Amino acid sequence: MSRIMIAGTGSGCGKTTIVCGLCQCFKDMGLKTSALKCGPDYIDSMFHSRVLNMRTGNLDSWFCDDETIKYLLARKECESDITIVEGVMGYFDGQGFGTKGSSYDIAGITDTPVILIVNCRGMSNSIGAVIKGYTGYEKDSHIRGVIFNNLSSRLYKDAAQMVKEMGIEPLGYLPYKKEAVLESRHLGLVTSAEVEHFQEKVTCIASQMKETLDIDGILKIAENASE
């Protein structure tokens, strides 16, 4: 059963954009893809549903017990070649200053490998400090790879080498492209129906991913998820 979690360093780092792009990439490859969102957020799930043309869902460890979460995930996996779980907020953010209800909590309950999205805008060497902090914050972070968002091709080689030395797999980068931005507002993302030229933007994101992400590496991590 192939699955991955796409988690981030915080809200606004590009999780939903990257999940939508990956869903489109996998669809283009002929893979039956399903998606789930950590927490009760229904707006991001609407984005997933629009790309995949199917109903998606949520995994919420605040409202559901562990067995229910495992059941909801297994139900999606049974009908898919690959399942993508989108994280919520920052990876370790849960109730207050605890991890209950966090993406990390869901990854632990379901034993799902995690790919961390790092928004690299305004950073260079500090990228390494951020990643080292996230991968070392808990004994087993479940983080198996990193995608660098808003990073130039010029900086990627050094960033990738830095991550490799930490024992984490660099899985590519995405440069900033204005035409691929999914709009947001003060209280978060607009709904998918409010995004102008939504499918064109998702197609643009997926096209960029095919050039600068290690899609095979992402699939390999997903395939190594425990059954």
Please describe what each predicted stretch is:
Residues M1-S2, E227:
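Intrinsic structural disorder
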Residues S2-C13, T17, C23-T110, V118-G145, ...:
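ATP-dependent carboxylate-amine ligase catalytic core
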Residues G14, G21, C64-E67, L182, ...:
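Residues in flexible loops and secondary-structure boundaries
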Residues V114-I117, L171-Y173:
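Short hydrophobic alpha-helical runs that function as membrane-insertion/retention elements
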Residues N125-E227:
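Internal gly/pro-rich beta-alpha loop/helix module
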